[in-house]
C-alpha cells in the first residue's frame, strides 16, 4: 500500500462495525461464563482480572480487585489475586478491560447514547486519575491495617468501627458492585443471599452508591469509558504493568500520514501519534482495536514483542 492508497470510508465503517460486533459478542460471552451458575456450574471463587463483585447472582468467579482487598483484610497476602493481574497484564496489557470486563461492557452500551462525545486532553486524564490512585491507596491502607489486626486476632473493634468498609473498601462504593450485586439483590433476584454490602434496606449508603453509579454512567454517555480512565483502581494497576506487555500496538511510519482518525475513535483518549511508532505504550490503551479498524492506511497493527523499555512520548 502506497501513501496515496486509502481504504474507502465505506470499508473503514464496515471494519469498525465488525470489530465492535466481535467485541460485543466476546464481552457478552465472558459475562455469561462469569455467571455460569445460571447453567448449573459451581462457584469456583477464582479471581478474574476484571471488575466484578463477589456477591453478584450466579457468579462462579470474583473480580481480582475484590479478591485482592478481601485477602488482605483477612490477614493474608494476596498472592493469587496479584499473580492473576500481573500475569494477564504482562501478556496482554489492558486487553481484558476492553474485551472482558462486565463494567466495561456496561460503559460501552451507555456509550451508544446519541450524545456529543468529549475528548479530554492528556492533562485532564492525568489529573482525574487521582481518583483511581486515591481508591487504590484507601484499599491498601485499610487492607493492611485490618489484615494486621486480623492476623493478631485483635480486629473486632476495628471491624466494628469501619463497618462494611472493613472487608473490601472499594466494593462498598464500586459502581460495578452496585450494578451487578446490590441492584439485583434489591429487586429480588436472589433473596437468600446475605452480605453486608448488599444493604438490605434503602439507607443512606445505598442511595449514595446509587447516586455514584448514575453519575458515572451519565459521565460515560459523554466521555467514553470515563470510569476506566479516571476511577478504576484495577485499571490503574493494569495500565502501569501493561506498558511492558508482550502484546501491544505499533504504527507503520511508511503508511501513516498522521490524519488522526485513530485518535478520534479511541474510547480512552490515547494520543497515538505522540508515541514512537515502534510501540504505543500508553497506560490507557485497552487494545479495543477501534483505532486499527479506523485507520484508512492500515498503518496500525497488534504486535507481539518484548519491549526493552517503556516507550517515552515525544
Predicted regions and their residues:
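Cysteine-cluster motifs in flexible loop/terminal segments that predominantly coordinate metals
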Residues: 228, 259-262, 285-291
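Short linker/helix segments within small regulatory modules
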Residues: 275-288
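Membrane-embedded alpha-helical bundles of multi-pass integral membrane proteins
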Residues: 2-231, 236-247, 270, 292, ...
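Walker A/P-loop NTP-binding motif of AAA+ ATPase domains
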Residues: 266
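Aromatic-flanked redox-active Cys/Sec active sites in thiol-based oxidoreductases
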Residues: 253, 297
Amino acid at each position: 500500500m502506497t501513501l496515496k492508497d486509502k481504504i474507502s470510508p465505506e470499508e473503514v465503517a464496515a471494519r469498525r462495525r465488525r470489530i465492535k460486533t466481535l467485541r460485543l459478542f466476546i464481552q457478552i460471552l465472558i459475562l455469561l461464563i462469569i455467571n455460569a451458575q445460571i447453567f448449573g456450574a459451581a462457584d469456583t471463587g477464582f479471581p478474574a482480572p476484571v471488575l466484578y463483585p463477589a456477591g453478584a447472582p450466579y457468579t462462579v468467579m470474583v473480580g481480582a480487585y475484590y479478591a485482592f482487598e478481601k485477602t488482605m483484610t483477612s490477614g493474608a497476602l494476596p498472592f493469587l489475586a496479584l499473580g492473576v493481574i500481573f500475569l494477564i497484564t504482562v501478556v496482554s496489557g489492558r486487553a481484558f478491560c476492553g474485551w472482558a470486563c462486565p463494567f466495561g461492557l456496561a460503559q460501552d452500551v451507555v456509550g451508544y447514547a446519541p450524545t456529543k462525545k468529549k475528548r479530554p486532553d492528556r492533562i485532564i486524564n492525568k489529573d482525574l486519575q487521582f481518583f483511581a490512585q486515591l481508591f487504590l491507596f484507601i484499599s491498601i491502607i485499610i487492607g493492611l491495617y485490618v489484615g494486621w489486626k486480623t492476623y493478631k486476632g485483635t480486629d473486632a473493634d476495628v471491624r466494628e468501627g469501619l463497618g462494611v468498609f472493613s472487608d473490601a473498601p472499594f466494593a462498598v462504593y464500586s459502581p460495578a458492585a452496585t450494578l451487578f450485586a446490590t441492584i439485583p439483590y434489591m429487586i429480588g433476584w436472589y433473596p437468600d443471599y446475605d452480605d453486608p454490602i448488599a444493604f438490605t434496606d434503602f439507607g443512606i449508603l445505598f442511595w449514595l452508591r446509587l447516586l455514584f453509579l448514575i453519575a458515572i454512567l451519565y459521565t460515560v454517555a459523554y466521555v467514553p469509558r470515563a470510569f476506566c480512565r479516571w476511577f478504576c483502581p484495577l485499571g490503574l494497576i493494569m495500565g502501569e504493568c501493561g506498558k511492558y506487555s508482550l502484546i501491544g500496538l505499533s504504527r507503520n511510519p511508511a503508511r501513516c500520514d498522521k490524519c488522526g482518525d485513530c485518535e478520534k475513535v479511541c474510547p480512552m483518549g490515547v494520543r497515538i501519534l505522540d508515541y514512537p511508532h515502534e510501540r504505543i505504550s500508553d497506560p490507557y490503551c485497552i487494545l479495543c482495536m477501534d483505532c486499527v479498524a479506523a485507520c484508512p492506511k492500515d498503518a496500525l497493527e497488534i504486535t507481539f514483542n518484548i519491549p526493552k523499555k517503556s516507550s517515552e512520548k515525544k
